[in-house]
Amino acid sequence: MYDLIFNDQNLGDTGSPKYFDLSEHLVPISAMDKREVKPSGMFTIKLELGEFMQEYPDRNVYDASQGDGGFSLGGIPPEELTEALLRYLPQSRSTQYGNPIGREDVREAVFHNYYGFDTLTGLTPDNVIFGDGGRDLLQKWYQLIVSNANRCGDIVLVSAAPWGSYAQGTYINGINTLMAPGTPENGFKFTTEAIDVSLEFALADNRRISGIVFTSPDNPTGNYSSYDELINLIEYSVEKGITHIFVDLIYQVVTDPEVGCYDVNKLYNALSKEAKQSVVFMDGLTKSAGGSNLRNAHMVVGNDHWVHLLKGLATHTVFPNALGEAAALEIYGQENPIDHPWVKRVTGPTAKSRAFVRERFQKLGYKFICDQGYYAFINIWPYLRKVIPKGITIADSQGSQKNRIDTAEDLKTYLTTKCGVAIIHGTVFNQPHFIRFSYANDPVYTAGAIKRLHDSVTALE
């Protein structure tokens, strides 16, 4: 026992449990039949190549599945990362807590060198918030929506072919994901008409659309939205009462040289006052530098109250990591970050691969999208309902053997385990007649992957 209490001291009722929050702020009981959030198959599909490698140890395999430049393009050499980390860390107390939203010099570097924000924006480096990768920042954005809405069950609107994790991160935070209508003819792109239809749908279900996500270049389709398209979509969303707008630019550096990055300074200055208070831009090192495991991304947040709230979320959840910040300072600390060697090692070969993908798939007669970024989105309808070559069977989702391709997932299994080329089946993106093909590779490797893919699907009967 401790002798800690003074004779005249009254600590109140210490023998009863007590809620941390006042009764009016307690989370209400709300029963729901919540589905399971399953692990992403994008991290495991490439492992299925092992079956092919075991049977054909002397043949090349091709991984065109996950967009992981840190793997497919070799990544950043460890000795270069070590040097960057040594430059970043202070000489003493090098493992102390960092700033929950990113160290000041890193935020200043991205503010001035990467975006070149001018005084007209009204922004400062305090409006730049770093996190532990894109997923971390998305989680904080979802939490911000719930905090601002003071209720669960509302909607975040995504495209007709969304990145798989958009629909999981929302759900984890008590938000529903609604996919806007979209067709192959418009590349599954967002339109103002699609926003209108989605708002009507939500209203009929007694819900509201609290957030919307625009991604350019897009994952999985590779679609690229022009400057004017982005401005129009952002402003239209605000006009229609959507209060949280997330613009995911994580692939914007990985474009053709003549396309380049968006001028976010110009884009931000062109927005209305209301739009500036509603929009968040995200970018990072995962794709531009192949820094997949560095887990470094940042948001530009014009709403100062949101900055305050996001700081609060960061202090109680996840801080930026030191190695990721060191890499960010190495890149953003130079005058023109997109000319950094780490970036060029990704953008150079990927641009060459992209040009080859367009030329080759067109020559072979495929229907596909291949604008910018890492991916081509390919219509594989002609290869469904086909029979696998004699003597070859694949396992279906129940583990039974079959000799027919009925679904895009069957095609993925056939290509990966029997042909040695890994892709992502479009079911992951709510488009079961498509596959995603990553060309973030050396052009020679990409050429081999296309040949293996084409030879394999044309062998189906």
PLM regions and their residue ranges:
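Walker B catalytic acidic pair
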Residues: D248-L249
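Short beta-strand
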Residues: V61-D63, M282, Y366-Q372, G426-V428
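PLP-dependent enzyme catalytic core of the Aspartate aminotransferase-like
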Residues: E104, H112, D118, G122-L123, ...
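Generic structural signal for small/hydrophobic residues in well-ordered secondary structure
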Residues: I45, A64, V110, V128, ...
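Conserved core segment of the aminotransferase class I/II
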Residues: D3-L22, E83, A109, A202-D205, ...
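Conserved core of the PLP fold type I
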Residues: S92-G241, Q252-E274, T446
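N-terminal small-domain helix-loop-helix segment of the aminotransferase-like
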Residues: L4, D8-G133, K140, L460
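Conserved glycine-rich beta-strand-loop-beta hairpin in the small C-terminal domain of fold type I
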Residues: K344-F361, K367-Y383, P389-G399, H433
